[in-house]
Amino acid sequence: GGLMGFGLASHVLGRGADAFRMSLWGVLVGVPAFCAVIGAAPLASPMIFALGVWMIGLGGGLFAHGTLTATMNMAPGDQTGLALGAWGAVQATSAGVAVALGGVLRDGVAVAATPASAYSAVYSIEIVLLLVTAVVMAPLLRRRAAQPLPAGTASSA
């Protein structure tokens, strides 16, 4: 899913799509993806689980490519390397903290409940965080929608 997300984002962004909107699509794919993974356990459905995992990768690829492209587009021409490094550092730090906190929470809940319940708790928090991300991104999308498109872009033709 992740590779497909990166490939799709590359294709769409290469045609002039807005990077912030691409990031939002990643968030919007992630919400039902985590719901599918949570729902797969009580339904005992490996297919729903696999679909959810694939969608998590797809959403992650869309989001990552969108945020990287937005970061690079906002950087001054002589500071794109710095922007890339900062983006990478934020991604790595965020992923590390998320995995650590998710693991601690999963283990803590698993002591009192089933492993499926523990993962459901972690993924439910992820859903809430994705929804918060969508809300936080709204001003970026509104501000960009109000700006005129540069002449010659695919969307201005």
Task: Give the ranges of each region predicted by the language model.
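Intracellular juxtamembrane helix-capping segments at the cytosolic ends
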Residues: 62-76
